[in-house]
Regions:
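Glycoside hydrolase catalytic-domain context in secreted enzymes
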Residues: 1-192
Length: 192
């Protein structure tokens, strides 16, 4: 086990930024001098979507189990089902050398027009938090990390990098943050 604080203090600003930006779409940058390897991440809220480094076309992904969309599995309100789904995804990630699965999508559904509603668990913060925690616990039980996304109030695809989600602090605290808080407290995802 590494002393993380010591390791970070030994990194240059450029090395820290490199870990945030990545070597390519699916790998973090490695830091050879400190023994930090690259990490392969892969999309996959509903199944592993691993692609070659040079491939961006989702139709060129490896063959993998495809689960129903989160909005469908959430209808079951079955924590054990989500745990089992997570375990299966964790096993597939290990078989394909994927270290971190980019999911689950925990953000709350705000509009029926949101382009990511299919992958968001629910418009209900309690349901989204409980089921995402089970999913995360399943994946991470196989020593594969998860990355809960798309952090708080990212509720549209059109101009999503430049739009503003204006709301009161009360709305953030009562509707958007609770699902993330539950997931973090009950499952401790490796990344947010």
């Amino acid at each position: 086990m590494h002393d993380i604080d010591k390791l970070i203090s030994e990194m240059t600003l450029e090395e820290k930024a490199g870990l945030c930006s990545g070597a390519d779409f699916w790998h973090t940058k490695k830091v050879d001098r400190l023994g930090i390897p690259d990490v392969m991440v892969s999309d996959g809220p509903h199944g592993l979507r691993k692609q070659d480094i040079d491939t961006v076309d989702p139709n060129e992904s490896i063959k993998a189990v495809c689960f129903p969309a989160a909005c469908a599995t959430a209808c079951s309100f079955d924590r054990e089902l989500m745990l089992s789904m997570g375990e299966t995804l964790g096993e597939e990630c290990r078989a394909e050398d994927v270290s971190v699965l980019l999911g689950p999508a925990v953000n709350i559904k705000r509009s029926p027009l949101c382009g990511r509603n299919f992958e968001y668990i629910s418009e209900d913060p309690y349901l989204a938090g409980e089921l995402s925690a089970a999913y995360i616990n399943g994946v991470q039980s196989k020593n594969v990390g998860t990355s809960i996304k798309h952090f708080a109030a990212n509720s549209q695809e059109t101009r999503r990098m430049t739009c503003s989600s204006d709301m009161s602090e009360r709305t953030l605290r009562e509707i958007y943050f609770p699902a993330f808080e539950t997931a973090v407290k009950k499952a401790q995802p490796w990344t947010v």
